[in-house]
């Protein structure tokens, strides 16, 4: 008789994805972040569900309801801070996952990569909407500034912004709809993640060498299940340490002040994981130009398969590309730092130079370096 895990229509899918899946024998810890992102998503959906039970999406009571969750609900403070810091862990894993993809040429799986870029946009949209919900000063002004960017779209911009606001400013209607979207989007993200995996399992995983690994595959279970559990434990340890020892480390103190449309905070800035994109937005003096640069800073990832000029898939054996990759990482750290600084000298010029370098590295320098390395192979 055939084993039930190989015969049952539902269990068969799980078996082929997590148990009998043929996996390259040499994938490193950089391949752990997919499973960590899955755990993050499940954690966010669960904590978010319990928060939604006590949260009210009304401008008069939203701030108070979050305070009520932290003070009066059993372990409400833990659920709230796990959710807030869980978002930070989510983005740390996302950035490392995308970085791995860039370094090891995983973008050559075009469908998987494009769904991944779509997922990145969806998660960023979800996180932005979630930041608005506590209805503190930074929530309100962040929502006002970011939604206002759409007014840069020619002709329809202003109408579009007022349509999204549900009025002539960020108000009750805006908060209610953002809560609705914040609730539904993670489930769309989960569905997209399923499609992401579906396309990945069509081709099989890449590996650090970038060479075909069909001749050397091992079953996912027990080798990589154990490895993923170790990764998950390390991530959960980091998340719990952050949540229990310094829950407000990555937050903004201004968000503990209830939203006040009559009082603008001195520095409006988003959460840390958006600061690099925010710095690129601010580095262009023109509104429409800034918005385009903001979108392109993420959308440029979709061009990676077209910009791949190397004869080798990964950067493992390409020292010049490696140097440029780590320069890109340093540049992103610089942009993140600049995004949190006030708009004044010398931060303006540093931000502009870092933004130019960001696009130059991805669009010009890395493809040229790859061509150079192709020629070096002939020596």
UniProtKB/Swiss-Prot annotation:
Disulfide bonds: none annotated. GO terms for cellular component: mitochondrial inner membrane; respiratory chain complex III. Its cofactor is heme b. It is a multi-pass membrane protein. One of its GO terms (molecular function) is metal ion binding. Heme 1 (or BL or b562) is low-potential and absorbs at about 562 nm, and heme 2 (or BH or b566) is high-potential and absorbs at about 566 nm. Component of the ubiquinol-cytochrome c reductase complex (complex III or cytochrome b-c1 complex) that is part of the mitochondrial respiratory chain. The b-c1 complex mediates electron transfer from ubiquinol to cytochrome c. Contributes to the generation of a proton gradient across the mitochondrial membrane that is then used for ATP synthesis. This is Cytochrome b. The gene is MT-CYB.
């Amino acid at each position: 008789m055939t084993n039930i895990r190989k015969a049952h229509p539902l269990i068969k899918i799980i078996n082929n994805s997590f148990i009998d899946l043929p996996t390259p024998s040499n994938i490193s810890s950089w391949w752990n972040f997919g499973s960590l992102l899955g755990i993050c998503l499940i954690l966010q959906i669960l904590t978010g569900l319990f928060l939604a039970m006590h949260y009210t999406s009304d401008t008069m009571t939203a701030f108070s309801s979050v305070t009520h969750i932290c003070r009066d609900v059993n372990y409400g403070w833990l659920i709230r801070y796990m959710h807030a810091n869980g978002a930070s862990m989510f983005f740390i894993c996302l950035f490392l996952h995308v970085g791995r993809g860039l370094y090891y040429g995983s973008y050559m799986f075009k469908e998987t990569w494009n769904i991944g870029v779509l997922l990145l946009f969806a998660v960023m949209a979800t996180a932005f909407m979630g930041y608005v919900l506590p209805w503190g000063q930074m929530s309100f002004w962040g929502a006002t500034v970011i939604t206002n960017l759409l007014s840069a779209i020619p002709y329809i911009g202003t109408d579009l912004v007022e349509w999204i606001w549900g009025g002539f400013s960020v108000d009750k209607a805006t908060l209610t709809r953002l809560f609705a979207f914040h609730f539904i989007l993670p489930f769309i993200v989960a569905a997209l993640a399923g499609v992401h995996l579906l396309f990945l399992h069509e081709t099989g995983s890449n590996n650090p060498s970038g060479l075909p690994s069909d001749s050397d595959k091992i079953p996912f279970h027990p080798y990589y299940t154990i490895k993923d559990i170790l990764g998950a434990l390390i991530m959960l340890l980091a998340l719990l340490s952050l949540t229990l020892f310094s829950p407000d480390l990555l937050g903004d103190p201004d968000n503990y002040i209830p939203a006040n449309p009559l009082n603008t905070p001195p520095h409006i800035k988003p959460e840390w994981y958006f600061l690099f994109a925010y710095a690129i937005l601010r580095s262009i003096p023109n509104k429409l130009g800034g918005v385009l640069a903001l979108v392109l800073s993420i959308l440029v990832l979709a061009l990676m398969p077209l910009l791949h000029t190397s004869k080798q898939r990964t950067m493992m054996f390409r020292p010049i590309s490696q140097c440029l990759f780590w320069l890109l990482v340093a540049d992103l750290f610089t942009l993140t730092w600049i995004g949190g600084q006030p708009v004044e000298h010398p931060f303006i010029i540093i931000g502009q130079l870092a933004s130019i370098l960001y696009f130059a590295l991805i669009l010009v320098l890395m493809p040229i370096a790859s061509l150079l390395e192709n020629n070096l192979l002939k020596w």
